[in-house]
């Protein structure tokens, strides 16, 4: 349940989050495992183990989990089987097969292999902050986040969202933090960053290297590079990598934070899940608020 990434989206129009209605809407897109001939399945699964509800809610915070099952068919296995069939049929009919015939054979090969294929399961969590009209997705890529949002849009019928963007250019703020040693008191820069130049391939990745290094500072001060990614620690609570597209990657809560609810018995799984969700959302909501303030608020949309 602990988020490892944070891609945040602004609801451009408030929605009515009636939970009974939400459950009904989610059930229309509920996850069902792949059948023998299915290559993939995508739908909602229960966030809380053993629950029939396809959402988990505490106060004004809602958690959803999109589950995707994909059959794994290695390309070399499909190719080997297909090549054998093509060769056999071409010899039998004494002619070269047309492109459309080869595609038909390939589809047949895939259908025959699917029942024997292994499955890969992927879960994507969405945290809906109805109080602040934000949706946070635990995804490391935009595609994965957009897929989950598309599923929610399909369930609700409408989902007016845009990626959260800050008013001030993030790379300018990040660069100034390092050059001017002006990080806010609640943040500590760790020894990891990515410096980007004007050319797309002109990237320097720094790891386990003090960012006050003279060479790094010279590049930034001369305007040859800007900081596009920066590893940070927030109030001894968590570490993360801030990206210039306003996404947070590699979120890691401190052990002391994750252990705060250890007094709850393991048998009380639902109570522990509830407490951990409240803890996590409280921390990440505060961090989001802090970052918005530091980056000049939210970018005005035209």
Please name every model-derived segment.
Residues 1-302:
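Intrinsically disordered, low-complexity, charge-rich terminal extensions
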